[in-house]
Structure formats: structure tokens, C-alpha cells
């Protein structure tokens, strides 16, 4: 028996998966309801959610953090689910962890650059 257990990187990915799942279950539906349904129906008074106000929010520090969380966390959750679904279906992608988590990392960097240049 090995007395020195090997360190695992899985808690990092499970943490991002859990955070993305919670974000996707609690925050994302509310934002989609506000922006995709209620805003076009005119449920908000006047310029409450005008383009200029939304752009100003998105260009503020808290708005940029919100956009990053809104995109990156569900992205990690989804790619983690796909990685484990492929494993459950006995479809073994060579270096699957590198493929799926690498793609999530690359897309996170692209999102970060995109949000910073907003």
C-alpha cells in the first residue's frame, strides 16, 4: 500500500463545476428572464434598462466581474459535465482531461480578454 497518496487536481475542477452549476441554477435564469423576456415586453419603466445604462454597468468593475462570472462559471460546469458524460458513455477521448479542461481554460482566457476590452 502506498503510504504517500498522490495529490489530485479534481477538487479544483469540481469546485468550478459546483460554482458554475449553482450560478447556472440561481443567477442565470433571473438574468435571462430580465433581459430576454421582461425587457422586450417593456416591463421596466422608462430608461431603467436602457442600452447606455447597461453599457455603463458592463464597463464598471463590478459589471465586468459579473460578466466574467456569468460566462466562465457555466462554461466550466458544462465542459466538466461533457467530460464526465463521455466517460460514462464509455467514449474515451485521448487525454480527455486536457481536452475539456484545456478548452475551458482557453475559452476563459478569451472571455477575460473580451470583457477587459469592452
From Swiss-Prot:
Gene Ontology molecular function: any one: succinate dehydrogenase activity
Membrane-related topology note: Multi-pass membrane protein
Pfam families linked: Fumarate_red_D
Chief subcellular location: membrane
InterPro entries the UniProt entry points to: Fumarate_red_D (IPR003418), SQR/QFR_C/D (IPR034804)
GO BP of this protein: fumarate metabolic process
Subcellular location: Cell inner membrane
Keywords (A to Z) from UniProt: Cell inner membrane, Cell membrane, Membrane, Transmembrane, Transmembrane helix
One cellular component term from this protein's GO annotations in UniProt: fumarate reductase complex
Ranges that cross the membrane: 24-44, 54-74, 98-118
Function: Two distinct, membrane-bound, FAD-containing enzymes are responsible for the catalysis of fumarate and succinate interconversion; fumarate reductase is used in anaerobic growth, and succinate dehydrogenase is used in aerobic growth. Anchors the catalytic components of the fumarate reductase complex to the cell inner membrane, binds quinones.
Similarity comment text for this entry: Belongs to the FrdD family.
Subunit annotation: Part of an enzyme complex containing four subunits: a flavoprotein (FrdA), an iron-sulfur protein (FrdB), and two hydrophobic anchor proteins (FrdC and FrdD).
Name this protein carries in UniProt: Fumarate reductase subunit D
Native source organism of the sequence: Yersinia pestis
Amino acid at each position: 500500500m502506498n503510504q504517500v497518496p498522490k495529490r489530485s487536481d479534481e477538487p479544483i475542477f469540481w469546485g468550478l463545476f459546483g460554482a458554475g452549476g449553482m450560478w447556472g441554477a440561481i443567477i442565470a435564469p433571473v438574468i435571462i428572464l430580465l433581459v430576454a423576456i421582461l425587457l422586450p415586453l417593456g416591463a421596466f419603466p422608462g430608461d431603467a434598462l436602457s442600452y447606455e445604462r447597461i453599457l455603463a454597468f458592463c464597463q464598471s468593475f463590478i459589471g465586468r466581474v459579473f460578466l466574467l462570472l456569468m460566462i466562465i462559471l457555466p462554461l466550466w460546469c458544462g465542459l466538466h459535465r461533457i467530460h464526465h458524460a463521455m466517460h460514462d458513455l464509455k467514449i474515451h477521448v485521448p487525454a480527455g482531461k486536457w481536452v475539456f479542461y484545456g478548452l475551458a481554460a482557453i475559452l476563459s482566457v478569451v472571455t477575460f480578454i473580451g470583457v477587459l476590452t469592452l
